[in-house]
C-alpha cells in the first residue's frame, strides 16, 4: 500500500518541520527522476515511482542518523500501513542486497540491526527498488547530478565508496537506459530541473 502524492508530500513537510535539511529537496529530485524514468520505461507506474522516490529518505524525519534513517523510515512507513514505501526505505541503501556496503555510520541498536538484516534477507528486489537506488544516486538537493559526480561527492564526504556499489549504480544506469532506449540525463531533465521550495 502507498499514500497518494499529496499525502506523501504532507509526510515530507511534516518530516522537514521535525528535521529541516537538504534531504527534502534531495527527495523531490529523486521523485522527479523516478517519475520521468518510470514513464519512459512504459511498463512501470510513474505515480507509484514518484511517491516511492519522495519517501525513500522519510526516516530522516526522526533526526540526523546514518544507517538509523533506514530503520526509522521502514518502521514509520510500516506503522502507517505503507508497506511498499517501507520496502523502499529499506532497499534504497543496499544495491547489492548486503548491509556491508552501507556508506556511513552504523548508528543503530542491536535490535534495529537485526530488523534491517532480517527484512533485507527476505526482500526480493523489483524494478522499483532498482529505480529508487538509481535515483538516489542521481539526486542532489540542487537538482539532477551526473551519477559519477554524485558518487564522488559521497566518497569525499565519507572517505570511501565501495567499488561494488559504484559498479552497481553504473549497471543500474545502463539497465534503465536500455529499457527506455534514451539517455538518463535527458529523461531526468538534468540541465533544467530545479526542486521547488517545500513550504
Give each language-model segment a name.
Residues 1-8, 48:
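Acidic-glycine-rich active-site phosphate/pyrophosphate-binding loop
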Residues 5-19:
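Generic N-terminal amphipathic, Lys/Arg-enriched alpha-helix
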Residues 7, 101, 157, 164:
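Active-site helical microenvironments for divalent-metal-assisted chemistry
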Residues 13-16, 40-154:
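Divalent metal-dependent catalytic cores for phosphoryl transfer on phosphate-bearing substrates
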Residues 22-24:
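A short, charge-rich alpha-helical start-of-domain segment used by transcription regulators
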Residues 160-199:
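Charged phosphate-binding loop/patch that engages nucleotide di/tri-phosphates or the phosphate backbone
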Amino acid at each position: 500500500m502507498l499514500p497518494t502524492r499529496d499525502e506523501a508530500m504532507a509526510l515530507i513537510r511534516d518530516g522537514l518541520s521535525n528535521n529541516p535539511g537538504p534531504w527534502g529537496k534531495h527527495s523531490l529530485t529523486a521523485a522527479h527522476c523516478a517519475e520521468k524514468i518510470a514513464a519512459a520505461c512504459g511498463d512501470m507506474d510513474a505515480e507509484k515511482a514518484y511517491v516511492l522516490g519522495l519517501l525513500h529518505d522519510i526516516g530522516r524525519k526522526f533526526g540526523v542518523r546514518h544507517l538509523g534513517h533506514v530503520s526509522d523510515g521502514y518502521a514509520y512507513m510500516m506503522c502507517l500501513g505503507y508497506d511498499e514505501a517501507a520496502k523502499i526505505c529499506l532497499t534504497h541503501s543496499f544495491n547489492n542486497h548486503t548491509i556491508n556496503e552501507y556508506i556511513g555510520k552504523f548508528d543503530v541498536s542491536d535490535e534495529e540491526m537485526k530488523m534491517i538484516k532480517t527484512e533485507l534477507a527476505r526482500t526480493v528486489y523489483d524494478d522499483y527498488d532498482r529505480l529508487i537506488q538509481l535515483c538516489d544516486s542521481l539526486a542532489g538537493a540542487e537538482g539532477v547530478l551526473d551519477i559519477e559526480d554524485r558518487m564522488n561527492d559521497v566518497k569525499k564526504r565519507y572517505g570511501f565508496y565501495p567499488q561494488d556499489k559504484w559498479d552497481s549504480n553504473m549497471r543500474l544506469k545502463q539497465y534503465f537506459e536500455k529499457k527506455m532506449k534514451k539517455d538518463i540525463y535527458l529523461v531526468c531533465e538534468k540541465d533544467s530541473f530545479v526542486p521547488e521550495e517545500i513550504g
